[in-house]
């Protein structure tokens, strides 16, 4: 039976993000900030995240988004993760998330050599080693799901 090339786009996003977050936590190469347990992800949120491993999931999500979109910067990802600001009896309005969390996660991915800053266009792009690593994890998920 011939092996097929599996990329990140061939697996379920939720499965990939959960698997990559577990991988990041298990390897211990990501430094968790001191403010991890008290920081809110956005100004319009009332409470910090309930999942103590939320930073790993945000890093995994950003790695996937950089792989798929590429060339986007912090401002774009602030809008991508944004949501509705609840204004009481007044109408809701869209609000961006905090840029510090996004910036920190992107720096951690740069330290892991998964992404790099695009010198020409700005923003972040996936590196060859980052593409290889993410595709390798996607292949493991694909093989486990399609096991005969």
Curated annotation (Swiss-Prot):
Q: Which InterPro entries does its entry note?
A: Ribosomal_eS19, WH-like_DNA-bd_sf, WH_DNA-bd_sf
Record-linked Gene3D superfamilies: Winged helix-like DNA-binding domain superfamily/Winged helix DNA-binding domain (1.10.10.10)
Q: Which SMART domains match?
A: Ribosomal_S19e
GO cellular component term, pick one: cytosolic small ribosomal subunit
One example of a Gene Ontology biological process annotation: translation
Q: Which domain of life is it from?
A: Eukaryota
Looking up Pfam families in the UniProt record yields: Ribosomal_S19e
Q: Ribosomal protein as a keyword?
A: yes
* Keyword Ribosomal protein among UniProt keywords: yes
Named from the GO MF annotations, one term is: RNA binding
Name the UniProt key words of this record, in alphabetical order: Ribonucleoprotein, Ribosomal protein
What is stated as this protein's family in its record? Answer: Belongs to the eukaryotic ribosomal protein eS19 family.
Could you identify this protein by its name? Answer: Small ribosomal subunit protein eS19
Q: What is the lineage of its organism?
A: Eukaryota, Amoebozoa, Evosea, Eumycetozoa, Dictyostelia
């Amino acid at each position: 039976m011939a092996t097929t090339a599996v990329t990140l786009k061939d697996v379920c996003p939720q499965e990939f993000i959960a698997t990559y977050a577990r991988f990041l936590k298990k390897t211990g190469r990501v430094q968790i900030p001191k403010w991890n347990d008290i920081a809110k992800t956005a100004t319009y949120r009332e409470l910090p995240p309930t999942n103590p491993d939320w930073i790993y999931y945000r890093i995994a999500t950003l790695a996937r988004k950089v792989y798929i979109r590429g060339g986007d910067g912090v401002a774009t990802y602030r809008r991508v993760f944004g949501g509705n600001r609840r204004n009481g009896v007044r109408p809701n309005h869209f609000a961006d998330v905090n840029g510090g969390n996004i910036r920190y996660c992107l720096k951690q991915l740069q330290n892991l050599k998964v992404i790099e800053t695009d010198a020409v266009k700005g923003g972040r792009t996936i590196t060859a080693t980052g593409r290889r690593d993410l595709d390798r994890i996607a292949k493991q998920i694909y093989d486990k799901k399609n096991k005969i």
